């Protein structure tokens, strides 16, 4: 598990990241909420760095890679070229999400990669939205897990990985993607036992016990 929010399966040379939500900033700007319009560039910069560091043979984008159906019309040509460069020389798979059911098909120009609902990697099943109930071998996104972690007289809120050893939920990779508390209703009944939390720090992923995670204020 990487501090960028991606997961790396070394044996399969596969890099997985969920919920990039490219062009979320420009979507908010159209609604009058002015945010710095650089979220797509920052998200792709981190993906480029992960790809350069690990040299994956395959990158799996685990759904909601684009923030909305109109995102392809707003993406800067330079950012589209960065995405092309990331895909060059490797397999790129777009798992479709609820925000981007068409995958890369709506992006300008020829975009590399295939589109699928799920992908099987050895004993793992990769999909965007986790199925209800306990699932063995599932790797999913969609829920944007975050944890409010107690320690040293204060709490800090961090994006996080969350797993019970049977299934893994990835944090949102996108710069503006936000998150939901893993103590909230969206995660209820999802794990067979109290899960282990991997809170994302600036340089590494920190293992956090379930007992150290607080509910939202």
Question: Where do the PLM segments sit?
Answer:
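Extended recognition/assembly regions associated with phosphoester-bond processing machinery
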Residues: 1-217
């Amino acid at each position: 598990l990487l501090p960028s929010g991606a997961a790396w399966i070394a044996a399969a040379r596969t890099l997985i990241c969920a919920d990039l939500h490219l062009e979320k900033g420009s979507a908010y700007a159209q609604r009058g909420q002015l945010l710095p319009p650089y979220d797509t560039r920052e998200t792709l910069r981190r993906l480029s760095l992960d790809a350069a560091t690990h040299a994956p043979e395959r990158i799996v984008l685990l759904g909601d890679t684009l923030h909305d159906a109109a995102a392809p019309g707003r993406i800067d040509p330079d950012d589209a070229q960065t995405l092309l460069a990331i895909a060059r020389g490797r397999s790129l798979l777009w798992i479709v999400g609820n925000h981007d059911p068409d995958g890369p098909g709506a992006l300008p120009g020829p975009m590399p990669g295939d589109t699928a609902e799920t992908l099987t990697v050895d004993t793992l099943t990769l999909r965007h939205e986790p199925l209800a109930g306990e699932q063995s071998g599932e790797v999913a996104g969609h829920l944007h897990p975050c944890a409010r972690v107690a320690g040293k007289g204060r709490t800090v809120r961090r994006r996080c990985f969350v797993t019970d050893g049977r299934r893994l939920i990835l944090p949102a990779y996108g710069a503006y993607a936000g998150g939901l508390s893993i103590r909230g209703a969206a995660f209820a009944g999802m794990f067979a036992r109290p899960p282990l939390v991997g809170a994302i720090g600036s340089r590494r992923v920190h293992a956090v016990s379930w007992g150290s995670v607080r509910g939202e204020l």
